[in-house]
Amino acid sequence: MKTIFFGTPEVAVPYLEILNRYTEVVLVVTQPDRPRGRGMVITPCPVKETALKMGLKVLSPEKITDIEADLKAAGADYGIAVAYGQILKQHIIDIPKLGIVNIHFSLLPKFRGAAPVQHTLFAGETKTGVTAFWIDKGMDTGPVFAYKETDILPSEDAKTLFTKLISLGGILLEDVIEYIRLGQIVKIPQTKNIFTPQEDGSMFKEELPLPTYAPMIKKEDTILDFNNFGAETFFNRVRGLACGPHAKVITKINGKEDLLQIIKASLLEKNKQCPPNMPRGSVVSIENDGRILVKCYDSCIYIDIVRPAGKKDMTAASFANGHKIKPGDVIFY
């Protein structure tokens, strides 16, 4: 079958490779070439680079509507979109005969939007997955085609979870391609209850989850506050921001305020207690394993790895010792 691929960043490359393996990719659509790297040299995106190496036709319009005629001329049976980066209007969605399927890194309707992996971790979810859905005019609101689910381990952060979901999504895309080849087109509404007939003649009502949203990460999302963040919330925010921009805290050392990036944090072991009377933002202990224990809103949390402004990653203990910080000092705000 003939297909069009819509995608831009590195995470989308494996999906183009899969689509090209099983279908005839007649057109690849990406975001325009942008300045990248230290020299800010105009460079094609990863999907475009890969597509050109494959010998595929690539278009990179500023606006998708600029290539409407090319999309129609391609004569595609369906499209696949992965992190394309532009909203597709209904008249564009309708061009491929069957429509366009998007691969989204959450279990829709939960975490619709640009940053589903980050917000899934912010929320402390223990399960997530990848959803293939038919694009409509809404933001990730179209009917579900298929999905795959996976557990989230406490040790996982945005980096490791992205890696897992990219792989899982590849398996899902292979399923989608095969379903379409066999004519098994599925469209399940995201937010309407599903009624399934039972053997006794009754109807089983499946309650679908309410939609939640995952907007693009803003600067204010990265600033953590020991006075108002509990240990679980702090830990989950650090995990969710592991791909960058990283979590940051305000430090005040010798009268100087600065922002310190938190690269890794960990929860207090269940068999250990947090001193109840120490002020929030104070250093409780400096551990031999390189961590420091800090008092937060409702408990204590370990800070493992930090990145001071203009410097490389280091253990939190190295940072503390370098600034002659000792237990009891209040340095975080």
From Swiss-Prot:
Enzyme Commission number: 2.1.2.9
Record keyword NADP present: no
Alphabetically ordered keywords of this record: Protein biosynthesis, Transferase
Positions of (6S)-5,6,7,8-tetrahydrofolate binding: 106-109
Pfam family for this entry, one: Formyl_trans_C
GO cellular component: cytosol
InterPro entries recorded: Fmt, Formyl_trans_C, Formyl_transf_N, Formyl_transf_N_sf, Formyl_transferase-like_C_sf, Met-tRNA-FMT_C, Met-tRNA-FMT_N
Catalytic reaction(s) noted: L-methionyl-tRNA(fMet) + (6R)-10-formyltetrahydrofolate = N-formyl-L-methionyl-tRNA(fMet) + (6S)-5,6,7,8-tetrahydrofolate + H(+)
Coiled-coil regions listed: none
Family assignment from sequence similarity: Belongs to the Fmt family.
Functional summary from the UniProt entry: Attaches a formyl group to the free amino group of methionyl-tRNA(fMet). The formyl group appears to play a dual role in the initiator identity of N-formylmethionyl-tRNA by promoting its recognition by IF2 and preventing the misappropriation of this tRNA by the elongation apparatus.
Protein name per UniProt: Methionyl-tRNA formyltransferase
Native species: Elusimicrobium minutum (strain Pei191)
Gene transcribed to yield this protein: fmt
